[in-house]
Regions:
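Catalytic cores and adjacent flexible loops of soluble metabolic enzymes
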Residues: 1-221
Length: 221
């Protein structure tokens, strides 16, 4: 998938790092679309530190940047100190997690912050706290529905973010096509994040909200 993403023209590919006991309880309630608890699902699919280091090296060999989302201060430290990540991506669920946001900001790396499930006041509060520590940040508009109908993407917010924050603004797009992303670019978005799969019909929680290699290539072109 790394090679295909690179061949399709993507600038970067993003992974996740979980240190489960540092970020959630073992008895986290089970989601309706999961057959197991979130803890068990992530424990089964989680990548090791060695795998992350290998993936970063493999990305470099294939001319695509390695990005990663930490979900706790410990995973952020591992990414910074051991994996040697060059950029952080913080997911929407951690937007109001100011201890984590500030901890990452102090590392002074370029950081992309998603803003799903949040009010404008919450976005501004996090921006104010982070920007005074690290000015190398970007925000992405996001609607946390998987897959997300285009009518709920609210890409008009992109223009508001550009006007208010005067930093790079993008879209974390969970629709199952490329057209919402194209609209976001027309509104000034300079970052587009899409879930990526080899088969939209595959089993799993994310495939239906993803695009395949041919679509990614079309989006980039």
């Amino acid at each position: 998938m790394v090679k295909l993403a690179s061949q399709s023209g993507a600038s970067a590919i993003k992974f996740q790092m979980h240190v489960l006991d540092d970020e959630m309880l073992r008895k986290t309630p089970k989601s309706k679309n999961f057959s197991e608890s979130l803890y068990d699902a992530l424990n089964r699919t989680n990548l090791s530190i060695k795998q992350h280091i290998y993936l970063k090296k493999y990305c470099k060999q294939n001319n695509i940047d390695y990005l990663c989302t930490p979900f706790s201060r410990k995973s952020a430290d591992i990414l910074f100190n051991e994996v040697k990540v060059n950029i952080f991506k913080i997911g929407s669920g951690e937007l109001t997690n100011l201890p984590l946001q500030i901890h990452i900001a102090k590392k002074k790396l370029p950081t992309i912050i998603s803003t799903g499930m949040s009010t404008f006041r919450e976005v501004k509060e996090t921006f104010d706290q982070v920007y005074k520590i690290n000015k190398k940040i970007a925000l992405t508009q996001c609607t946390s529905i998987y897959p997300c109908p285009s009518k709920y993407s609210d890409i008009g917010v992109i223009k508001d973010y550009i006007k208010k924050f005067k930093i790079p603004i993008g879209l974390s797009d969970h629709t199952n096509s490329i057209y919402t992303s194209l609209g976001a670019i027309a509104l000034g978005a300079c970052i587009i994040e899409k879930h990526f799969t080899l088969n939209k019909k595959a089993k799993g929680p994310d495939h239906a909200s993803s695009i395949e290699p041919a679509e990614l290539k079309q989006l980039v072109e």
